[in-house]
Structure formats: structure tokens, C-alpha cells
A protein has these predicted regions:
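Lipid deacylating catalytic domains
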Residues: 2-250
Length: 250
């Protein structure tokens, strides 16, 4: 299946309201330690969209004793804070110690995992990929409650950005942006999220901020305007983030 057809296939989640679904993948090696990596997808998709990233991380030597979690939630009709609370409630039903957990969120999922922290869920590190911490680019439509909750004017994002639990945990936040260069030059956005928004420039001090670069031989508008954002779901395009997460697992 081509990348474009794969993207169109991912839009199946737009028209229906998905229930919370959480699946854990047992570690490659048995251990008495409790170490978890929870990966949360972005808008208009489900956990399958992040399996490439999960599989890449799972095969790292230092990940052999880590338990990975795939999360699916509704991104269309449910504001992300409500989804975060539902995910936390579901995880609390599991008989696991989550005190040593890495939270990874792609796009909208980055706000979901931050909201999980705001709700009191523990983490040793939080990684966001192409997340609109200060809203998406202004030309992206936000027609339903899910994407509207991401807007820079959303009360949900304003509340999250001043939440005491979120503020206290920012020394564990690792924020990644994607920018790209095509025939029209360098663009400081990924087609959906600006570099400053993905890096959470208004959040103050965080553990680290990183920018990843993509290069195109043709104008991105000849493909899809948000193609760079979408390509951040493919491990080969975000190797700096993969390596960084690997170090966090050591």
C-alpha cells in the first residue's frame, strides 16, 4: 500500500466515535521491574498508525524489558482532556506499577499524554512528536469537538498550559518538531503545526527541544500540504527522536 493510500486508510476514524482501547505487549524478557512505554496516536487515526514507531522502539536492545502499550481513543467528537481522563481510568484498572513510564504522544496524542500527567498519571519522561502545544497552523479546519479542543484559543489548552501538575513535570518533557525544505525553501512548520508550537516555546523550561528536518525534491503542495506532519509516524523520518527515546530507556 502506498503512503498516500495508507494515509487515506487512516481517516477511517474521522466518521465514527472510537471507544477507548488499550493493548499491552509483554516484554521480550521476563523481569521483576515495572517499566512501561505508552504510545498515543494523533487525530483521525488509531493505535495502528503508531505501530511502526512502537515496533522500532521495541526492538532496541535497551527496550527488551519494557512493556509497550497501544492506545486507541476518539479524536473526532471527544475533547482531548476527556480522552486523557478515560485513558487514565482504564490504565488504573490494570494491575501494574506505572511509576516508571515513558509517555509518547504524536500530534494530538502529545496533548493527551500531557493531560494524563495533569490528571496525576506518573511518568519518568514525556516525548511529544509534532504536537500543537499552542494550536495547529491557522489554515487547518477544526470542525468538530475533538480538533477544536486543540485550537490555540481552546479553553482546554489554556487550562493545560497553566496546570500545576503539568508545569511541575516539564523538566521531564522532550519536545520534537518537524520542519521541511522543498523547492520553495525552508518552511518552519510541518504543514499542520509550526515549529514554535511543536517545541512548546511558551511553556518555559523543559528537559529538551529538538527539530527534525525533511527534504523534498518537489513542492510539498504537489503531494499533500500536511505530508511532513504525516511522515513523522514513520520511524525512518524521525530517527533523532527514536535515538533519544532509546537513551531515555537506558
Amino acid at each position: 500500500m502506498s503512503h498516500f493510500r495508507s494515509y487515506l486508510h487512516s481517516l477511517r476514524a474521522v466518521t465514527g466515535k472510537a471507544a477507548i482501547n488499550i493493548v499491552d505487549i509483554v516484554p521480550r524478557e521476563e523481569t521483576t521491574e515495572h517499566r512501561h512505554c505508552i504510545i498515543v496516536h494523533g487525530w483521525a487515526s488509531d493505535a495502528r498508525a503508531m505501530r511502526r514507531v512502537r515496533d522500532e522502539l521495541k526492538e532496541l536492545p535497551q527496550a527488551r524489558t519494557w512493556r509497550f502499550w497501544d492506545v486507541t481513543y476518539d479524536t473526532t467528537w471527544t475533547p482531548y482532556p476527556e480522552s486523557a481522563r478515560q485513558i487514565v481510568a482504564e490504565l488504573k484498572k490494570r494491575e501494574h506499577d506505572f511509576s516508571r513510564t515513558i509517555l509518547i504522544g504524536y500530534s494530538m496524542g502529545g496533548l493527551v499524554v500531557r493531560q494524563m500527567v495533569a490528571e496525576g498519571f506518573p511518568c519518568t519522561a514525556l516525548v511529544s512528536l509534532c504536537t500543537p502545544h499552542h494550536g495547529p497552523v491557522p489554515w487547518i479546519p477544526v470542525p468538530t469537538r475533538g480538533p477544536r479542543s486543540l485550537a490555540h484559543w481552546s479553553r482546554f489548552t489554556k487550562d493545560l498550559n497553566r496546570n500545576p501538575n503539568d508545569i511541575a513535570a516539564r523538566d521531564r518533557y522532550h519536545l520534537f518538531a518537524v520542519v521541511y525544505r522543498d523547492r520553495f525553501g525552508l518552511h518552519n512548520n510541518d504543514g499542520m503545526v509550526t515549529q514554535d508550537s511543536a517545541l512548546g516555546k511558551q511553556l518555559g523550561e523543559v528537559a529538551s527541544r529538538h527539530t527534525m528536518h525533511l527534504k523534498y525534491n518537489i513542492p510539498v503542495t504537489a503531494l499533500m500540504p500536511f505530508d511532513p506532519h504525516w511522515r513523522a509516524m514513520f520511524p525512518q523520518n524521525i530517527q533523532p527522536a527514536i535515538r533519544h527515546i532509546g537513551k531515555l530507556m537506558e
